[in-house]
Amino acid sequence: MMSNTILPRNFYERPTLVVAGELLGKMLKFSNFSGIITEVEAYIGMSDPACHAAKGYTNRTSVMFGMPGFSYVYFIYGMYYCLNIVTEAEGFPAAVLIRGLKLIEPLEANLGGPGILCKRLNITKEHNKQDLTISHEFCVYESHLKPDYVCTPRIGISKGQEKFWRFKNLRSCVDYLPIG
């Protein structure tokens, strides 16, 4: 199911909506955890009012303007971190938010919601601006899973809700696990 092939930079250096759909079923690896990506959201450029880069370049959003394949981790509601992966060409601010994960190592229930996911994996601000294309400790691996998914409006935002840029698996990831 999981290969040892880390997704290369050119995987992320494509249109964000393409990357978002293709991240579903891939394996996120962080420290001793690995799991199937089950839900993501796309945030694309300064014309997207829900994108953190909508108001331009800042210290916080600088990573979004950088090379694709880097992590963008930020703090919300005074209690949760969120993990994004930068997409598109350098200079164009875009990223995919990782919203859901089915943990395989250790085998656990689905981690739904970006804050819960980061809390369980212990992803914090110190993991911001990490190159996910070089280290087997924090990366996304290729997999042979090609899940069916649905696109819906993004959730938990006040602007840009009309965009169907949330990608979610149609079936449980348990369906993808080997039996026995």
Swiss-Prot record:
A Pfam family assignment: Pur_DNA_glyco
Key words of the record: DNA damage, DNA repair, Hydrolase
SUPFAM superfamilies for this protein: FMT C-terminal domain-like
Gene Ontology terms for molecular function: alkylbase DNA N-glycosylase activity; DNA binding
Domain of life: Bacteria
E.C. number: 3.2.2.-
Gene Ontology BP, a term: base-excision repair
Main enzyme class: hydrolase
The keyword DNA repair is assigned to this record: yes
Keyword Coiled coil: no
Alphabetized HAMAP family for the sequence: 3MGH
Family from the record: Belongs to the DNA glycosylase MPG family.
Protein name: Putative 3-methyladenine DNA glycosylase
Biological source species: Wolbachia pipientis wMel
